[in-house]
């Protein structure tokens, strides 16, 4: 076989490989037409086979709204879950306001007004006025914080200079007033103030520094009694609302009381301001954002509505009705069932006595957040992202009503802080920090409460008590207490003699005098003799004090029930604690229990009035007896023989 040349070998290899490669030929026009027809037939068949709605192209998921710098804004709001401090009036506090001049003003049901000054940390008392002889109906502070006024059912208006905390004028109105509001802006010639007649829709405009003669009367603007009058200082316009759900815009003396020209509507039908009338509700609180562009309202139907001021269009609606809270509790438990039931009872009482009208709403300094009180506590709502970002005071035993918000630094230093001062490393200047504070009133309480960024101190010293007793008891209260209480009605120790041994206890008559008095008098009278420990839960507590032995009986020495006496130094933080059994807030009778473990979840729900000092093993033995698993009642009775009060 002849040898092949290199080129011949390469050609032969190429020829052998060529058949294996596919031919790259183009489809003819006829073949292309056939292929398209087949493809169309397949598509038609697929369409015929498809039953139901056609699949749509997947839509892009909506991007969640985010408020830029939200964390910074929230840092300038109170964040503590419990109130730091509380102060007293003689009677139930109904109103509270905070001024731009760093004053906090509180008013109580008996016509008294108190001025407090915001300092770097906390507040200090300034002055006390007996402003009205009767009930205070409404209070108002001017937009720049210089003037304050109050109206009461003594048919009078009192005007105060805030900075100098002095009463400067008194107007005799000649009618029962309902609402009041300063309607002047800085620079106006007249310090005009508006007051409404309680039983009609009339609005009277006065010179706050002048006499009793009104400058102007709106007698046809509203046909029903007014519920709110509020000034928007940015747009120099006033918004008023009445019980028929109507909302009106108007101006003060500089614009001759006419309709404002700086809004983008002429007819109310172009707005959403008929929303309240459509829902058969009316605003009980109105406030404006710092830039004046948003109006926040709370309605009598417990819905929070936020409008745009210029257009009158509805922006947000938050449902805070009782039915919504009930559904929320059923979906995801917010509170223990017993506590939820107690708070619902308070809400129904609020509606019964028409106290819902005292609940207000406020904006923060940025206008991005609204704050208002609910049965769960103080809600902080981000109106831009539509989310509840914080709830304050959820574990407190108070129903928050009116709020006043202080933000920033109290203006104690006369010289302004310069850029150089801020950049310096001066430790004195660095200590000057903002102290955001919410000051709030509570339903049927003669105290106002302060929520800050600081949690309350939980020390055992009486000096660190967060509830400040800044009011002395009246002569009548002292007389009643002296007559009712003999010198030996209370004691600081007692021995409970049981069928299983003696339990020595220490009592706290100073911290909870009424509870200890009830226990001591019952004990001396032999009331507890023969009572069984009718409820025993191993690893929890032993309960007694019911003459019926069912857990449903017993009463106090005064007959019926008496109020709770919570004290910050007396907690369920250790075993062998004596505490009152109850069926809810302020329902103490004669039943009490002794814990065998720490039970902190009972704090501010049951009154601690004593501790076991000797005989802990007796308590343990009683807690270990066999009981009916359904009723927690022991199979063999363990009873109190008698109680010796020393």
Swiss-Prot record:
PPIase that catalyzes the cis-trans isomerization of proline imidic peptide bonds in oligopeptides and may therefore assist protein folding. May be involved in pre-mRNA splicing. GO terms for cellular component: catalytic step 2 spliceosome; nuclear body; nucleoplasm. Residues 490-645 form the PPIase cyclophilin-type domain. The lineage of its organism: Eukaryota, Metazoa, Chordata, Craniata, Vertebrata. This is Peptidylprolyl isomerase domain and WD repeat-containing protein 1. Its EC number is 5.2.1.8. The gene is PPWD1. Its main location: nucleus. Inhibited by cyclosporin A (CsA). Residues 1-30, 455-490 are annotated as: Disordered. The keyword Acetylation applies. It comes from the Eukaryota. InterPro entries: Cyclophilin-like_dom_sf, Cyclophilin-type_PPIase_dom, Cyclophilin_A-like, WD40/YVTN_repeat-like_dom_sf, WD40_repeat_dom_sf, WD40_rpt. The modification N-acetylalanine is found at residue 2. Identified in the spliceosome C complex.
